[in-house]
Every structure is written in C-alpha cells, then in structure tokens.
C-alpha cells in the first residue's frame, strides 16, 4: 500500500492568483481622496436687501373665536305609517346653518336641503339651464354664446349636438363622436339652424 500525502489547497493561492491580482489592481488604481473637508466661506455684501416671503401682509391675522357659525346636521328618521307606507317629510335630509348668539333670533336660521321642492320640479327645470335650450357638452356654452362667437350648432349623424369648433377639434384627435364613440368623420355632421 502506498500512502499518498494528501495535498491541501491553500486559500489565496499563489502570488499570481486572480484574487491577488484583483486586490493589487484595486489598490493601485484607486486615486487617493483627501479626508479633510474644506469649509465654505459665505460672503455677505453690505447693502443686499433681504426679502421675507413668509408673510403676505404686515398685519397679523386675527381669527374671531367668539362666534360659532357652524353647520348642524339634523337627522330625522322617517317613521312608517300604520298602513306600511313611509311618512313623507320635506326636510328629512336637511341641515341648519345658525349662529350661537342668543341675541340673534332663530328666524334667521337657514335650512339647507338636498331635495328639490315640488314647485321647482313642476316648472320643468332639470338643471342649470331650462329644458329646450341647446348647449355644447364639451365647452358648456349655450346657444347665445355659440352664435355670438361666430360658431355654428352642429349635429352628428348619431344625433348628438355640439358647437362647430369643439366637434372639429375633437375629430382632429379621434374620428369618433365625443358622446357615444360612434365612428364619424368631418363629412358625417351637419349644421342645425334654430
């Protein structure tokens, strides 16, 4: 039996190993950096005007905390009638804007409600403009503003109404109706004369 001497590998290898070459490259190629920091000198010149932009006015802002004008939410629950129907209340979803001053009478309280009273519903008012008026849904101009600015009221073949400028500009970007996205082009709409 022959006995072999086990050979051990040394970490780090010989002098010309890759790790040794890498270490020598890193140390020789790194430029020396000075560890001392130099302070920056600020030079003030006489006559420079300093402008304070933190305050908009010279007078202090005074907040009066002696009066409490606040919105009070009034929640009234609807009570069912005996026959099962709910009792209708006109001020069910309302709030009261009032002052805490006892000197002022409660007659000056303002009631704000989310429901439209019956009288305005019956008059035909559906929004900011009465029904029957024509407006462009893009620029929100009404008929009179459109005509005063030299534009026309136009309708697409799908029936949607716009001012001529808004529809022309919209068709430059996309060949579809701005409302329903049906494919149209500049030949697929016509002016409306009212």
Curated annotation (Swiss-Prot):
Zn-finger segments (RING-type): 136-181
UniProt motif (SUMO interaction motif 4) ranges: 71-74
Listed result of changing residue 134 to E: Abolishes homodimerization. Strongly reduced E3 ubiquitin ligase activity
Subcellular location field: Cytoplasm; Nucleus; Nucleus, PML body
Expression sites (tissue/organ): In the embryo, expressed primarily in the developing nervous system with strong expression in the dorsal root ganglia and gonads. Ubiquitously expressed in the adult.
Motif SUMO interaction motif 1 in this chain: 40-43
Name of the protein described by the UniProt record: E3 ubiquitin-protein ligase RNF4
């Amino acid at each position: 039996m022959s006995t072999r001497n086990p050979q051990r590998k040394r970490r780090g290898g010989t002098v010309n190993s890759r790790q040794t070459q890498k270490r020598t490259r890193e140390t020789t190629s790194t430029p020396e950096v000075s560890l001392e920091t130099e302070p920056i000198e600020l030079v003030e010149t006489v006559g420079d005007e300093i402008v304070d932009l933190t305050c908009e006015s010279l007078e202090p802002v005074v907040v009066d905390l002696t009066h409490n004008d606040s919105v009070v939410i009034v929640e009234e629950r609807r009570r069912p009638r005996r026959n099962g129907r709910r009792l209708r209340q006109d001020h069910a979803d309302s709030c009261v804007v009032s002052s805490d001053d006892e000197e002022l009478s409660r007659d000056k309280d303002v009631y704000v409600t989310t429901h439209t009273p019956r009288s305005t519903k019956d008059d035909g008012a559906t929004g900011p403009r009465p029904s029957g008026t024509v407006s462009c849904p893009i620029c929100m101009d009404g008929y009179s503003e459109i005509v005063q600015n030299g534009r026309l009221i136009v309708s697409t073949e799908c029936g949607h109404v716009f001012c001529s400028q808004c529809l022309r500009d919209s068709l430059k970007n996309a060949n579809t109706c701005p409302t329903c996205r049906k494919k149209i082009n500049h030949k697929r709409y016509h002016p409306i004369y009212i």
